[in-house]
A protein has these predicted regions:
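Conserved short aromatic-hydrophobic micro-motifs
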Residues: 110, 164-167
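Short, contiguous, well-structured surface segments enriched in hydrophobic/aromatic residues
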Residues: 68-83, 101-140
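Short non-catalytic regulatory patches outside canonical folded cores
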Residues: 115-162, 169-170, 175
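Extended intrinsically disordered or low-complexity regions, especially N/C-terminal cytosolic tails and loops
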Residues: 1-105, 151-158, 162, 178-238
Length: 238
């Protein structure tokens, strides 16, 4: 297990803070674009705000690691017991892993719920009323329902989907047919070997994927076909 350092966590926190700032700008822009609609309900706005919340919570987790969990003084003041350096490292690594998996799950859930809602509004008959498996949903939405296909978007979501599915098995990839899989995204091949742990899902990877998800989501909700829907798209998950 790689030792966590305050410097490493601080760098990750700065990266995520920069993305949060971009997310602030995204949310303001989408609220302005759909100014006549209720921002807490309309699915085009909540598509951004749900991700905004996820990124914010994950940034807080990194700040907690940086400011508190990796500092012995916090343990003395709050836990009221002596903790060895190895104990602090072990618990901090466990918290980091837990927070990273929550980041993946929440990002995936936000995208999935938003894409299903948007597809139903664009075509209520597509993908069994938006209830088919998620790969069918995002391929249909991105490839055939928008005015322009967002470059590399299906590869990005294939990658996120397979990573998220591996989270269900504590980071080990399994598929019902026993087959391996691979995704090529931005020129890099990510391999998923059946029955083996995936070894590339660190914080840097998660933050990079999340930032690209952020850009994709804004691209989708700004698409002219989505903008042409002149009624409220109710998000029951908001």
């Amino acid at each position: 297990m790689k030792q966590l350092t305050i410097q490493d966590i601080q760098k990750l926190g700065h990266r995520l803070a920069t993305i949060r700032h971009s997310m602030d700008e995204d949310l303001d822009a989408i609220k302005a674009l759909y100014a006549g609609l209720e921002p807490r309900i309309d699915a085009r706005i909540t598509a951004i705000s749900k991700l905004h919340g996820t990124f914010g919570m994950s940034h807080l987790c990194l700040m907690f690691l940086h400011k508190d969990l990796l500092n012995r003084s916090w343990w003395v003041t709050n836990i009221k017991q002596r903790a060895s350096e190895s104990d602090i490292q072990s618990l901090a690594c466990s918290f980091s892993s837990y927070s990273r998996m929550a980041f993946i799950q929440s990002t995936f859930s936000s995208v999935e719920s938003s894409f299903r809602l948007l597809l139903r509004e664009l075509d209520s008959s597509a993908c069994n009323g938006g209830t088919s498996d998620f790969k069918s949903i995002y391929e249909c939405l991105l490839k055939s329902k928008l005015s322009q296909y967002p470059t590399d978007s299906v590869d990005l979501l294939d990658l996120l989907r397979l990573v998220r599915n591996s989270v269900h098995n504590n980071g080990v990839y399994f598929y019902r047919t026993g087959q391996d899989d691979a995704v090529t995204w931005k020129g890099h091949i990510y391999n998923f070997k059946h029955g083996f742990p995936i070894d590339f899902v660190n914080w840097d990877f998660c933050i990079t994927v999340a930032d690209n998800i952020r850009m994709l989501m804004r691209n989708v909700v700004e698409d002219s076909n989505i903008r042409a829907i002149d009624r409220l798209i109710i998000d029951p998950f908001s």
